[in-house]
């Protein structure tokens, strides 16, 4: 699938330009990693059961359009989203899609751990290493 950057998206064009500018220094494939509640919820709504926890950009487009087709109230009542999530999930999907399109990234990895959890795990692992080496 050919992925093109949509400069007319709702995402700030300066952010998209920054992403595009970074591409010249990257060789090889580009991978997207999404953390947090919005991408996790989009992944769950997609109904995918995938051991790799990845979602193709085409699937993200579909689930984004699906969620966007509901009103705020329907997102809360029919999709069972929390009120704070129902309010921001559509713009969040637009941001993920715009960033992936500009980076020409075909899929996004949706880990079970959030960014905060991953940083805490990393710090704890480093602490254990220091403690181990000091004994």
Identify what each model region corresponds to:
Residues 1-11:
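Single conserved hydrophobic/aromatic residue that forms the stacking wall/gate
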Residues 12, 53, 60, 88-92, ...:
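Generic structural signal for well-ordered, non-membrane alpha-helical segments
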Residues 12-18:
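Conserved ATP-binding module of the ATP-grasp superfamily
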Residues 18-31:
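Phosphate/pyrophosphate-binding loops at sites that engage ATP/ADP/AMP, CoA/4′-phosphopantetheine
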Residues 29-38, 106-111:
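Short glycine-rich phosphate-binding loop at a beta-alpha junction
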Residues 39-43, 116-117:
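Short, active-site-adjacent cap segments at secondary-structure transitions
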Residues 44-68:
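Gly/Ser/Thr-rich active-site loops/lids in small-molecule metabolic enzymes
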Residues 67-101, 108-135:
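Glycine-rich phosphate-binding/hydrolytic loop that grips phosphoryl groups
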């Amino acid at each position: 699938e050919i992925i093109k950057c949509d400069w007319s998206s709702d995402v700030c064009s300066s952010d998209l330009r920054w992403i595009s500018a970074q591409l010249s220094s990257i060789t090889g494939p580009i991978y997207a990693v999404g953390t947090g509640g919005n991408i996790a919820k989009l992944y769950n709504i997609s109904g995918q059961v995938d051991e790799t926890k990845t979602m193709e950009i085409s699937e993200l487009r579909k689930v984004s359009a699906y969620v966007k087709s509901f009103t705020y109230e329907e997102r809360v009542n029919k999709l069972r989203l929390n009120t704070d999530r129902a309010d921001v999930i559509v713009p969040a999907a637009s941001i993920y899609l715009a960033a992936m399109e500009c980076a020409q990234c075909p899929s996004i990895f949706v880990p079970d751990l959030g960014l905060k959890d991953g940083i805490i795990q990393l710090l704890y692992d480093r602490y254990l290493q220091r403690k181990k080496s000091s004994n």
